[in-house]
Amino acid sequence: MNTNTDFIIHEPAESYHFRSRSGEYMSSHLLADFRESPALYYKEITGQIDPKESAAFTLGRAAHSLILEGRHAFDRDYIVCNGPVNPRTGEPFGKTTKAYADWLEEQDREVISEKDFAFIMKLQAAVCVHPEAVKLLANGEAEGVVRACCNGVPCQIRMDWFNPEYGLVDLKTCDSQIGRASCRESVFVYV
């Protein structure tokens, strides 16, 4: 068994995504956008479209951080908080209020709500008791980048996890029964 992982590059996610969005490297997400619409792809790599992130994607990134990189990495990048509390009601200000927006602007880490963090903790616990997941994640590297040229096109991937014995591990999160069925089906795409 070859356990050499010298081909894996470690860099911040922001650098990886910038290099995709600038058109320097093709990624699976950009390729999917290109398949959907070459015009969309062009607008993305020329900066005509601001990258937007859904709440589900943010939650997934936070889950990946905690599950694959550990609590130290999670705490480095995220803060668990519902936001500032309205002194009149004793409840957090709504996310659409100026008070919340001002507070959010002052944060040096991404904010994860207490409810979302509880969900992420459940995901982590589920992974920790799943025998196959434990085996796959027992040895390896999280969030490594690999770059190569494919048919003359510079490509890159940011792997969730690389296990030298089992290969690439793609952690999927689901928040519904429909999502779980979809995740189960996607296993066959990768195998």
Label each PLM-derived region with a short phrase.
Residues 137-184:
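Mg2+/Mn2+-dependent nuclease catalytic core
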Residues 185-191:
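Positively charged, low-complexity/disordered segments
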